[in-house]
Design a protein with these regions (language model features):
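Intrinsically disordered, low-complexity regulatory segments
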Residues: 1-139, 148, 210, 222, ...
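Short acidic, hydrophobic short linear motifs in intrinsically disordered regions
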Residues: 239-242, 251-264, 291-300, 456-468
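Core structural elements
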Residues: 138-149, 166, 196-198, 247-259, ...
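Basic, low-complexity terminal or inter-domain segments flanking catalytic cores
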Residues: 2-3, 15, 24, 150, ...
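Alpha-helical scaffold elements adjacent to nucleotide-binding pockets in ATP/GTP-utilizing enzyme cores
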Residues: 15, 19, 65, 88-96, ...
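Metal- or metallocofactor-binding catalytic centers and their adjacent structured scaffolds
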Residues: 216-253
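C-terminal or mid-to-C-terminal helical accessory/interaction module adjacent to the motor/catalytic core
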Residues: 116-194, 244
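Conserved short loop/turn motifs at secondary-structure junctions
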Residues: 1, 81-82, 158-162, 244-253, ...
Length: 696
């Protein structure tokens, strides 16, 4: 009899099977097999919050197949993902297969390589019940909030709405930022910049006014700037101080889940959901030419910065051979994880550092290659030497005013030869200064006054929202992608370029939640709940008690809100159309229902006339001349079709434009991305160009 190994996905099963050989059957559970059914609450509150799990609809045959395979096996190993969710899947599998939870049949693979699989199979353990209970508590908590609160929100605002323990706080953070922006009052200020040329030199350098005789200067109006400009007319400028120094810049640590999502958003333009999908593929295994199915990275749901000694030895050897010993730090770098990190895992790193991105590029999709290269570069750079910069700072004085100039040159590239961390906001660019000496006289080539106004705080991007959620301790990095997908798909938040902007629906819902359920959308309260859930995971808090403590207050608050708001309905603004109701003559309006927008008569319920809502793009169909309209799939992905469908079958994922191709006369389509492009879809043409700023 062979041994049975159960994992979540077919891709993972294929990779593991390659390493285990013929003595094992490796099958996939396709994720969870049991869950709380969607049709009802499925939590018995009176019986200590007992969950009522059921086999997930459509998985009955899969469960039968797993039972059949288990009966024919000598040993059964549960090899689901090494995290809270994976532990719960193993626990549910043990239940349906009749396996004792204290049996040592749980194995973990931090990386799906020969050594990773061998190590995992050599160290089986029993199911971690504390981890399972933490997952159950989180699941039941989310179910109580969602299933109790969503109907109330839907009744008061609009059908089909949802509320959630994490998603509602995420929306609040975005709404609060929008309120900050609206309330912001810009303040005027001025700067004065100069360009100087040292005596006997042709190279100029820039400096900014920093202080006067009374200290650091603040210029608040044009009159003050004019006076300073007048004071400096025909003044002699002298170098008062020159300070030369050395600055070391150390590499960033390897990725954890949250930083991978942030950096992939900034550098690659990937949404978090896309990042996690591709990372899962790289972890579970990709067919590499000459190697077969190979797991390329370690487990991607982690908040630990720990790196194994073996990985450090391998990457050190690679750096030494490829760059030379001078690119190695004096000793290997070890990074400290956050205090609440699950340190059982490693950071996200290549499972085999010797597999460079270019060596596997031919076997990867474009997205897989980009993300693997990002992970590989970041990890390798984290074990490289510091970048060393030679810095110069100079003070230039004239008539009691001091200008400051700074610059640097790279003396040794170190890790920056491979990887430079990006930021949401570009760092100030600094250039190298010419040779300067104290008491040197310099000529002022240009003196420029600049008017500025203080700027409101920036709207959140996906990257900065993830950073904020992590800093506030809301949710867990593994859930951020799903949270952002939820709040955008439910139209509480919309995307404008990279910015996340609250919709009217998001603001109305958040204001209702703040008024009636302040704890649910309170950042500190949500963070405390996360800390309590972590205590359950560590076995220091009982999960039933956690739920009981939460639910008592929540239930009272909900009952009071229902009583206080009985008969109250909050109304969203309705956009008027130019369509006149053909039944009663009123001007029809755009409404939003459970399944999206529609056009209705405002005379409801006396007049129940409704018509389909069509979003026109202003572009004519290239096939029949009809209107190109925006359509959405079941998952709300946008595509473009013809208003004359089904008579005309024009359809495109890319947005058509009114611009004609200069080569063949066909219409150009817009392809979105980090750098949007316009391209001609006419077969054999191939014309493409970068989209104008207005097109982006």
């Amino acid at each position: 009899m062979s041994d049975l190994v159960i994992v979540e996905s077919p891709a993972k099963a294929k990779t593991i099977k390659k390493y285990l050989g013929s003595g094992y059957e490796v099958v996939a559970s396709m994720g969870h097999v049991r869950d709380l059914p969607k049709s009802r609450l499925s939590v018995d509150i009176k019986k200590n919050f007992a969950p009522k799990y059921e086999i997930i609809k459509g998985k009955e045959k899969l469960v039968d197949d797993l039972k059949s395979a288990a009966e024919k096996s000598e040993h059964i190993y549960l090899a689901t993902d090494p995290d809270r969710e994976g532990e719960a899947i193993s626990w549910h599998l043990a239940y349906i297969l009749g396996l004792p939870t204290d049996e040592t049949n749980r194995v973990e693979f931090n990386e799906i390589t020969k050594s990773g699989v061998t190590n995992g199979m050599s160290n089986p353990r029993s199911i971690n019940i504390d981890l399972v209970n933490a997952q159950q508590a989180r699941r039941i908590l989310d179910r109580l909030v969602g299933y109790k609160l969503s109907p109330f929100i839907s009744q008061k605002i609009r059908r089909g709405l949802s509320a959630g323990r994490v998603q509602s706080v995420a929306v609040r953070i975005i709404v609060d930022r929008e309120e900050e922006i609206r309330k912001f009052k810009p303040e005027e200020y001025w700067s004065i910049d100069a360009k100087f040329i040292p005596k006997g030199s042709r190279k100029s350098f820039s400096a900014s006014l920093y202080s006067d005789e009374n200290g650091k200067i603040k210029i608040t109006n044009g009159e003050q700037a004019d006076k300073i400009e007048a004071d400096l007319q025909n003044a002699e400028y002298v170098i008062a101080k020159v300070k030369n120094g050395t600055r070391k810049k150390s590499p960033a640590p390897p990725f954890i889940t949250s930083t991978l999502q942030q950096e992939a958003s900034r550098k690659l333009g990937f949404q978090s959901r896309r990042t996690m999908k591709v990372a899962q593929e790289l972890y579970e295994g990709v067919d590499i030419e000459g190697m077969g199915a190979t797991g390329l990275i370690t487990y991607m749901r982690t908040d630990s910065l720990r790196i194994s000694n073996v990985a450090i030895e391998e990457v050190t050897e690679y750096i030494k051979n490829s760059y030379g010993e001078k690119f190695l730090p004096p000793k290997p770098r070890f990074f400290k994880s956050r205090s609440n990190a699950q340190d059982g895992h490693e950071a996200i790193r290549p499972s085999m550092p010797s597999l460079t991105p270019d060596s596997v590029k031919a076997s990867l999709t474009s997205d897989q290659y980009k993300l693997y290269k990002l992970i590989w570069n970041r990890f390798t750079a984290s074990q490289m030497a510091d970048c060393i910069q030679k810095t110069t700072q100079a003070d230039i004085v004239a008539n009691g005013y001091t200008f400051k100039a700074s610059g640097y040159r790279v003396d040794f590239e170190g890790f920056t030869t491979l990887y430079v961390e990006s930021k949401d906001v570009e760092e100030e660019k600094t250039t190298q200064l010419p040779p300067l000496e104290k008491d040197m006289i310099v000529r002022c080539k240009e003196l420029k006054k600049n008017q500025h106004f203080t700027q409101p705080p920036a709207r959140y991007t996906e990257a900065s929202l993830i950073k904020a959620l992590e800093e506030y301790g809301i949710g867990r990095p593994s859930t951020y992608a799903a949270t952002i997908t939820t709040i955008t798909s439910h139209e509480y938040v919309k995307r404008e370029g990279k910015s996340l902007v609250p919709t009217e629906l998001g603001e109305v819902t958040t204001n209702l939640m703040k008024e009636r359920f302040p704890k649910i959308v309170n950042v500190k309260f949500t963070n405390q709940m996360e800390e309590d859930l972590d205590k359950v995971e560590k076995g220091t808090e009982e999960w039933h008690a956690l739920l009981d403590n939460f639910y008592g207050d929540f239930d009272k608050t909900l009952k009071k809100a229902k009583a206080d708001m009985e008969g109250v309905k909050l109304h969203l603004k309705e956009d008027e159309t130019d369509i006149i109701c053909d039944k009663c003559g009123r001007q029809m309006v755009v409404k939003v229902g459970r399944y999206g927008k529609f056009i209705a008569c405002p005379g409801y319920p006396e007049c129940k006339n409704i018509i389909k809502y069509v979003e026109k793009t202003g572009v004519k169909c290239p096939k029949c001349g009809g209107d190109v309209i925006i359509k959405r799939t079941k998952t709300k992905r946008i595509f473009y079709g013809c208003s004359n469908y089904p008579k005309c079958d024009f359809v495109s994922w890319n947005e058509p434009t009114n611009e004609k191709c200069p080569q063949c006369g066909g219409i150009l389509f817009k392809k979105k991305g980090k750098k949007p492009t316009l391209f001609c879809a006419t077969e054999g043409c191939g014309y493409t160009k970068t989209a104008d700023t207005d097109d982006k």
